[in-house]
């Protein structure tokens, strides 16, 4: 199928058919999505005074999150603004039921089948630059070593000052932050990120070196070749900030919410660990899969990354882990090394997040 003249279009058609994904919307959903342009000009919000930015891929249109960071007397202050989808998608509405049915946006090469109609996903809910957008904001205070000291949630309105790409931010990470409205925020964000990465290592969180393939296509949609997408430090910066927001949300749910959804990742199963140990032994690698070995597996992965076959070994170890699952019961997250964890930072493209959202 990938060798045909219309390979990409054929792939899209077959993938949608095979997985029962529809690109069409029921009339009731489209009707609800035609939200009258609301007048929020009179609503003033202190959040608008902060130079929030979004950092996403070059092709992104649904901007779920925006960040602002600054140095504080005690360390760092981070604000993470998350698109307030629940303002437009009411519980039990046609939009809500359709999102629950789809569960997630589907991303394919050069095509996205959104969970919500584009009027919402790419416009009203998307934290576009220079446009006032409703959000759920979490403000997190860190000490000088990057440990969370306190947090608070509140709804508000932001006006992002820039739509940045991972490549643009990576260049500034390497060459220095450029003069801009957000320069001070980005400098503080980089400093906080460096602390969080150190803490991640101390925590023993898993960090696999696995490339992500993506298709390079012509303007007509013909496939030229398949490349490996490199994971940049700018990706990791946003990942770490979203992790901080998500563990704060999980803590909030555990303390104050009557119910909520956690993202659990349980301890590896013994049979899979035994198989992994044997495979590694066949490759001349001594790893017994003891409790001590498993607890220190992140350090083991770092050693393996010096080998030529590191990508293969990373994949083998990943396949030996249990799959992360959602549950109303908290069981902790083995891979991230968190006592509790949830997802609430991608509401435009993941329906379950609406249940986990702190309110």
Listing of model-derived features with the role each one plays in the protein:
Residues 71-73, 142-147, 217-221:
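Short acidic-glycine loop/turn motifs at beta-strand connectors
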Residues 85-87, 144-146, 267-269:
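Conserved nucleotide-binding/hydrolysis micro-motifs of P-loop NTPases
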């Amino acid at each position: 199928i990938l060798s045909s003249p219309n390979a990409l279009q054929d792939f899209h058609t077959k993938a949608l058919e095979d997985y029962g994904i529809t690109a069409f919307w029921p009339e009731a959903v489209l009707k609800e999505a035609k939200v009258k342009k609301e007048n929020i000009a009179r609503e003033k919000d202190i959040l608008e005074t902060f130079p929030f930015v979004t950092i996403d891929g070059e092709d992104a249109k649904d901007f779920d999150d925006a960040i602002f960071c600054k140095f504080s007397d005690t360390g760092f202050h981070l604000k993470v603004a998350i698109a307030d989808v629940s303002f437009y998608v009411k519980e039990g509405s046609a939009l809500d039921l359709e999102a629950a049915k789809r569960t997630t946006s589907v991303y394919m090469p050069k095509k996205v089948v959104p969970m919500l109609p584009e009027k919402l996903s790419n416009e009203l809910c998307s934290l576009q630059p220079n446009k006032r957008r409703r959000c759920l904001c979490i403000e997190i205070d860190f000490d000088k070593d990057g440990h969370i000291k306190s947090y608070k949630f509140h709804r508000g309105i932001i006006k992002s000052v820039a739509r940045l790409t991972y490549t643009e931010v990576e260049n500034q990470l390497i060459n220095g932050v450029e003069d801009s409205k957000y320069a001070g925020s980005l400098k503080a964000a980089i400093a906080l990120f460096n602390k969080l990465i150190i803490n991640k290592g101390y925590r023993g969180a898993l960090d696999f070196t696995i490339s992500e393939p993506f298709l390079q296509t012509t303007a007509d949609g013909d496939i030229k070749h398949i490349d490996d997408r490199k994971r940049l430090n700018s990706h990791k910066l946003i990942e770490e900030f979203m992790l901080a927001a998500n563990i704060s949300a999980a803590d909030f749910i555990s303390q104050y919410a009557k119910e909520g959804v956690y993202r659990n990742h349980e301890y590896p199963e013994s049979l899979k660990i035994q198989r992994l140990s044997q495979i590694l032994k066949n490759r001349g690698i001594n790893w017994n899969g003891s409790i001590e070995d498993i607890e220190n597996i992140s350090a083991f992965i770092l050693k393996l990354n010096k080998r030529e076959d590191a990508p293969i070994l990373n994949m083998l170890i990943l396949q030996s882990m249990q799959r992360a699952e959602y549950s109303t019961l908290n069981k902790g997250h083995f891979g991230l090394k968190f006592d509790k964890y949830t997802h609430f930072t991608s509401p435009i493209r993941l329906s379950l997040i609406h249940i986990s959202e702190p309110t």
